[in-house]
Amino acid sequence: MATATVRPAAQRLRLLLSPLKSRICVPQAEPVATFGTAVTSAKVAVNGVHLHYQRVGEGEHAILLLPGMLGSGKTDFAPQLQSLNKKRFTLVAWDPRGYGYSRPPDRDFPRDFFERDAKDAVDLMKALQFKQVSLLGWSDGGITALIAAAKYPSYIRKMVIWGANAYVTEEDSRIYQGIRDVSKWSEKARKPLEALYGYDYLAKTCEDWVDGISQFKQLPEGNICRHLLPLVQCPTLIVHGEKDPLVPRFHADFLLQHVKGSRLHLMPEGKHNLHLRFADEFNRLVEDFLQ
């Protein structure tokens, strides 16, 4: 029984992290240049920390890209930074505090860490003098996007989310526990993130993330942000990969039911990393929705 339980978790882990192994690299500080077709990077002081971001494009429509667990703008959104329309959009891909290049501080996971990320994200974009923004949120970044849209409705124009969930189930908890020990990950899954963070930081942060996300299971109905969904006012596109082994379809259906006026787009061959595996299709979908 133990073997049967561990194997699916390991498979899910590989599916989660495998898209990063060919794209992830250690972020390098890049010179700030004229915003346009060249991706630039910088840091800005927000809420007592220095948040790192990448920026590209010169369009009127500002878009913030929000990465997933242990992710960063550079590792999670390369195809979007490269290929989304630079004349129509200005793209900003951020590293949440404690992730990527937004260190120090080390990442921690108090119960309100998603709310903290949402405030950081909005305040970052305000510090960059954007009057209003749209959100692209993957996985944990999708949860952060939902909270930001609910709490700052006048600031968010539109939102695209995928791989997100508003609550935690027993099934989710089993998946989380299966990835706690990074020494049990495959080398292909571990090495790229180890190059980004170093082994000790990666191992500790992964354990802390599992504890942080698992604490929601102790709340009524496993609540992360389900109580905030009725407050979302912006047009919302939910994208779900029908072969996603990490986030079951019922999470997308729940969001569709509780986010007023939202739309659900299913990708039959999509998995958790659908925006990387099917980048061209995903980018077209995003551009059509945000126009």
UniProtKB/Swiss-Prot annotation:
GO terms for cellular component: mitochondrion. The gene is Bphl. Residues 1-37 form the signal peptide. The record marks 140 as: Binding of alpha-amino group of substrate. InterPro entries: AB_hydrolase_1, AB_hydrolase_fold. Monomer. May also form homodimers. SUPFAM superfamilies: alpha/beta-Hydrolases. This is Serine hydrolase BPHL. It catalyses: L-homocysteine thiolactone + H2O = L-homocysteine + H(+); valacyclovir + H2O = acyclovir + L-valine + H(+). The modification N6-acetyllysine is found at residues 74, 86, 119, 126, 191, 217, 243, 260, 271. GO terms for biological process: homocysteine metabolic process. Disruption phenotype: No obvious phenotype is observed for Bphl knockout mice. Valacyclovir is rapidly and efficiently hydrolyzed to acyclovir in vivo in the absence of Bphl. Specific alpha-amino acid ester serine hydrolase that prefers small, hydrophobic, and aromatic side chains and does not have a stringent requirement for the leaving group other than preferring a primary alcohol. Has homocysteine-thiolactonase activity (in vitro) and may play a significant role in the detoxification of homocysteine thiolactone in vivo. Catalyzes the hydrolytic activation of amino acid ester prodrugs of nucleoside analogs such as valacyclovir and valganciclovir, converting them into their active forms (acyclovir and ganciclovir). Coiled coil: none annotated. Keywords: Acetylation, Hydrolase, Magnesium, Metal-binding, Mitochondrion, Signal. Belongs to the AB hydrolase superfamily. Lipase family.
